[in-house]
Amino acid sequence: MLRPIITLLCLTLMLCTAAGPAGATRIKDIARLQGVRSNQLVGYGLVVGLNGSGDSDSTAFTVRSLVNMMERLGVTVDVNDVKVDNVAAVIVTAELPAFSKTGSTIDVLVSSIGDADSLVGGSLLMTPLKGADGKIYAVAQGPLAVGALAFGGKAATVQKNHPTVGRIPGGALVEREVPFRLTPGAELHYQLTNPDFTTVTRMAQAINKHFQKTLARAEDSGSLKITIPEDQQNEPIHFIADLESLNIRPDSMARIVVNEKTGTIVMGEDVRIATVAVSHGNLNLIISENDQVSQPLPFSEGETVVVPDTSMEVSEDNGNLVVMEMGVSIGDVARALNAIGATPRDLIAIFQAIKAAGALHAELVVL
C-alpha cells in the first residue's frame, strides 16, 4: 500500500517540476543572441503565364524588361511588336534566416508593381535576390500561390482577397551564405525583444541559479552579458541550448492598445485605474426627407410643384454613472463598462477620457 502512494507522489512532483512556474517563458522566446539575425533580400522579376490579367502596354518598364529578357535568351524582338497582357513586372522579397546554408530553400513574396489585375496562375521567372550589400544571395523561380481571384468585364468586376500579391513556398534557392559563426570565446551577449529591467534581472538570476555560478550580468534593460564556463568555451553550442531552455516569468509595462479603425482593444493584466466615475451616453440623429406633391385647387392659376419634406429626430440614451474604485483589475474594468452597455468604440473613448483625467495607471497606445 505504501509503494503506490510513494509512486504517485513522485509522479506528481515530476509533473509540477516539468510544468515550471505559472506564466513562465523560455529565454529563447523573449531574447536572442546578438549577431544571430535574418537578412532581407529583394529582387526585380517577371511573372508570366497570366490569362490576360498582366500589365498593359502603357507600362513601359514591363515591355522593356521582357524585350531584354528575350534578347538574353537569343531571341530578337521589336519593342513595338511586344504585348504584355500575360506578363507582369514584380518585386520579389525574402528573408534569409541565420545559418542558412547553400542549397537550402526559403519562401519568397511576389508583389506587382505595374497595373496588372491579377497574378493568379502566373509563374515567376528566374530572379536574383540581392542583399543590402548588392551581392546575390538567392535565386527565386516557380509558380505562385495567390489565394485570391479577380474576374470582371468593362462594367463590373468581382474580387476576393488580394490578387496582385502571391507567395512561393520554398521558391528561392540559397546561393551564398552569410558569413557568421560562433567562435570560441568567453562571453555571450543577449538582447531582449521587449526591454525591461525586471525581466532582464530575472533572466540573470535564473541563469546564475541554474549553473550555480555568477555567469550572467544585466548591462541595461535590454541586454545581458553571459560568461561561458571555461570547460565549455570550446563547444558553446551545448551551453547555449541549455541556457535558452531555462524558464522565467517576463514582466511588462501595463498597456492598453486600441485601434480606432477596427474597434479592437487589447489590455494587459496589470492595468489599474484610480477611483473614477464614468458616464457615457449615445447621441442618435435620424434625418429623413420625402418629396411631397403640392396640388393647386381646381380652376386656379397655381402650378403643381414638388415640395421636400424634411424631418429630424434627435434622441440621447441615458448615460449610466458607474464608479470604479482605486486599484481595480482589468476584469473589474471590463465588467463595469459592459454593465453600462459600452461598445468597443465606446470603450476607446472612455479609456481616452480616463487617461486624460489622470486615473489610468497604464500606457494608452492608439493605432
Curated annotation (Swiss-Prot):
GO BP annotation list: bacterial-type flagellum-dependent cell motility
- Which segment of the chain is annotated as a signal peptide? 1-24
Annotated Gene Ontology cellular components are: bacterial-type flagellum basal body, distal rod, P ring; outer membrane-bounded periplasmic space
The UniProt entry, under Pfam families, shows: FlgI
* Gene Ontology molecular function: structural molecule activity
UniProt entry keywords in alphabetical sequence: Bacterial flagellum, Periplasm, Signal
Location of the protein in the cell: Periplasm; Bacterial flagellum basal body
Record's subunit section: The basal body constitutes a major portion of the flagellar organelle and consists of four rings (L,P,S, and M) mounted on a central rod.
Q: Please state which protein family the record places this protein in.
A: Belongs to the FlgI family.
Q: What does this protein do?
A: Assembles around the rod to form the L-ring and probably protects the motor/basal body from shearing forces during rotation.
Q: What is this protein called?
A: Flagellar P-ring protein
What is the name of the gene encoding this protein? flgI
